[in-house]
Amino acid sequence: MKYLYATQHLTLNAIKHAKGGHVGMAIGASPILFSLFTKHFHFDPDQPKWINRDRFVLSAGHGSMALYSIFHFAGLISKQEILQHKHGQINTSSHPEYAPNNFIDASTGPLGQGFGMAVGMVLAQKLLANEFKELSDKLFDHYTYVVVGDGDLQEGVSYEVSQIAGLYKLNKLIVLHDSNRVQMDSEVKKVANENLKVRFENVGWNYIHTDDQLENIDQAIIKAKQSDKPTFIEVRTTIAKNTHLEDQYGGHWFIPNEVDFQLFEKRTNTNFNFFNYPDSIYHWFKQTVIERQKQIKEDYNNLLISLKDKPLFKKFTNWIDSDFQALYLNQLDEKKVAKKDSATRNYLKDFLNQINNPNSNLYCLNADVSRSCFIKIGDDNLHENPCSRNIQIGIREFAMATIMNGMALHGGIKVMGGTFLAFADYSKPAIRLGALMNLPVFYVYTHDSYQVGGDGPTHQPYDQLPMLRAIENVCVFRPCDEKETCAGFNYGLLSQDQTTVLVLTRQPLKSIDNTDSLKTLKGGYILLDRKQPDLIIAASGSEVQLAIEFEKVLTKQNVKVRILSVPNITLLLKQDEKYLKSLFDANSSLITIEASSSYEWFCFKKYVKNHAHLGAFSFGESDDGDKVYQQKGFNLERLMKIFTSLRN
């Protein structure tokens, strides 16, 4: 037990040094992490993101010091990094933060999402294992472990993702519950009254209950590995054990004091000094956690050597390297669409068909709307065919997004998912977390404006684009035709470290002669030009057609008009000043048009003489889509009034 106590002592000291932290879980759940990492967990100390490593997700991320203490004694985190806990060091931040070169498999902290990402990791593993089973059944035979707290299990997303894990029989998933019956404001029983055994068994899980004795946790994990179902292990723990706030909800977060250290030393019969731990402890951890990994990695490398001449091996390496350039560069042809003058969602179907080949590693998730959004490759799904690229999630948008993040974190897979734009809010917390981790997930949102029509204001998403654009590292495309759609689709396929969102229409849009897929990647470009224009009109998506119609009216009045198509305002705002000044004219007026409440359009005011914006700032109604669109001011008469006011 002294090795476990050493990690707990380090945890207390590191949190005291940081001037406070989540002592309760970091101490109480430490037997879970200790048993896992000293007996079961497989990874490569020299290659943190080795494809066949076990994955560990601390969904209750506030217990991070329990993990960092083990990493320190095993030689994976330095003394200096421990001393910087919560003070600017990514490897020991308050909540675990994923990086491409560290030993954290997912950024966590927003409760429930770690559970969902773990489900995504195991789903990705299952898909990859099936894809390459002809090579070997040992290429993807790892486990994913996730530690959850009571807060994780109270979040709605945990219910969503646990059903998915049960439906798809993700038996490589082992969830360990830090069941301490206490949370920040109260005892758990005051806010939760469910039977966890019944809850998980009802959705196809294996359930195990144990106390926090190391040997019992060990045996529970061994038993879980023998199951053909995902396993939920409820571990009875004690929050802030061996401190003055033991088993009290005040123990969730506090600053350890001298009384705590005296209590700890008395109850554990230890006498450690902060960062003056015996060499024998470091030696034991390196032998127990690190040295046992060598044979596992050596066996895997030998397996790869034996497979390198197999026909599937090149595909395997392209997939696990996430070499999206090799997989998708020059795969799309904007000219090969079934029908022009279509809704931009229809082009999605065309482009998905173009990359529907055995080398593509794209998998599509949808929230029960594939027949409306066309986020689907072929006609089957995973329930019917283990080789299918389509994964039905049901009406679980938040679960879908957390699972997508987990699949991207696992590696080897490109993942696309989506729903109607009005429901992007359901996924927003996971979109934000994926962007924070620089994950190349790909969202498609359709039904993007008032012209959804009869479904009414609940389905008319005037307010969603600014929400998506406001998230750092999220690249939002709103194309106006097939060429711009192709560019946005291609950008999403090739992205290595950025979340891509493609926003598409349900209503048909006319194909436009002068649109340009290459220029689309600048975010905006001149679609129609007149030198020394009196007026510049900039628009995105369906409003580009309205701009073209208005230009025809003004041309008859001898007004010189320049039209800018702006399919990606975020990319455009990142262009240099020279390019931006080439689009605008200091002597011209500017009208910007978009059926959304986005504020970014006002950033262009400084480049022109004066500026007015036609946007959408109110809910719609249930009526004919074109009628609602017109009533909300997206018509030639309204534009003429705006132009007249600018001239005056």
Curated annotation (Swiss-Prot):
Cross-referenced PANTHER family: TRANSKETOLASE (PTHR43522), TRANSKETOLASE 1-RELATED (PTHR43522:SF2)
Domain of life: Bacteria
GO biological process, one term: pentose-phosphate shunt
Alphabetized UniProt keyword annotations: Calcium, Magnesium, Metal-binding, Thiamine pyrophosphate, Transferase
Cofactor(s) recorded in Swiss-Prot or TrEMBL: Mg(2+); Ca(2+); Mn(2+); Co(2+)
One Gene Ontology molecular-function label: transketolase activity
Name assigned to this protein: Transketolase
Pfam families reported for this sequence: Transket_pyr, Transketolase_C_1, Transketolase_N
Similarity remark: Belongs to the transketolase family.
Metal-binding found in the keyword field: yes
Catalytic reaction annotation: D-sedoheptulose 7-phosphate + D-glyceraldehyde 3-phosphate = aldehydo-D-ribose 5-phosphate + D-xylulose 5-phosphate
Residue positions binding thiamine diphosphate: 62, 109-111, 151, 180, 252, 423
Subunit structure, interactors included: Homodimer.
Major enzyme class: transferase
CDD domains: TPP_PYR_DXS_TK_like, TPP_TK
Binding positions (substrate): 22, 252, 345, 372, 447, 455, 506
Chain sites annotated for binding Mg(2+): 150, 180, 182
UniProt-listed Enzyme Commission number(s): 2.2.1.1
InterPro entries: THDP-binding (IPR029061), Transketo_C/PFOR_II (IPR009014), Transketolase-like_C_2 (IPR055152), Transketolase-like_Pyr-bd (IPR005475), Transketolase_bac-like (IPR005478), Transketolase_BS (IPR020826), Transketolase_fam (IPR033247), Transketolase_N (IPR005474)
Cofactor note: Binds 1 Mg(2+) ion per subunit. Can also utilize other divalent metal cations, such as Ca(2+), Mn(2+) and Co(2+). Binds 1 thiamine pyrophosphate per subunit.
Upper lineage: Bacteria, Bacillati, Mycoplasmatota, Mycoplasmoidales, Mycoplasmoidaceae
Active site: 397 (proton donor)
